[in-house]
């Protein structure tokens, strides 16, 4: 599966079309016409600094979404693999502009979460949702 490309649920949001990433632009990636939309692909994130696999097949689904603009491990993997970084939230956990119908909404508010879940279901992106406790929260 490594190398497979795919489209993602929020590719219609303006931030995904920003060459080089958003809100911080990587000029090298921009010059290669790379943006969030063009960079969705299955990767092998490799190992952490202790030599352990970052994604383990026996935990959860064995498939993890990497978001280089969101979180330390994802950022490090994205930097290593030279991927576009999209950081959707400001310092108040609100979606910044260029995120369409989500702009200005607080990511942790129940109403925002419910809207996102409804969007995923209405667009047949998710039919059932549950929670998987990440291994880094053990």
What do these predicted ranges mean?
Residues 1-63, 72, 76:
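Protease-associated
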Residues 48-138:
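Residue patterns forming the tRNA-binding/recognition surfaces of aminoacyl-tRNA synthetases
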């Amino acid at each position: 599966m490594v190398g497979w490309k795919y489209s993602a649920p929020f590719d219609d949001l303006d931030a995904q079309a920003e060459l080089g990433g958003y809100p911080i632009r990587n000029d090298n990636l921009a010059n290669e016409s790379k943006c969030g939309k063009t960079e969705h692909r299955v990767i092998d994130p490799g190992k952490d600094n202790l030599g352990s696999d970052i994604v383990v097949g026996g935990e959860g689904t064995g498939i993890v979404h990497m978001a280089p603009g969101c979180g330390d491990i994802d950022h490090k993997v994205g930097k290593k693999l030279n991927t576009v970084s999209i950081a959707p939230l400001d310092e108040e956990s609100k979606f910044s502009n260029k995120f369409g119908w989500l702009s200005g909404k607080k990511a942790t508010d129940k109403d925002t979460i419910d809207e996102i879940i409804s969007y995923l279901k209405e667009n047949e992106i998710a039919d059932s949702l549950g929670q998987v406790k990440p291994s880094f929260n053990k």
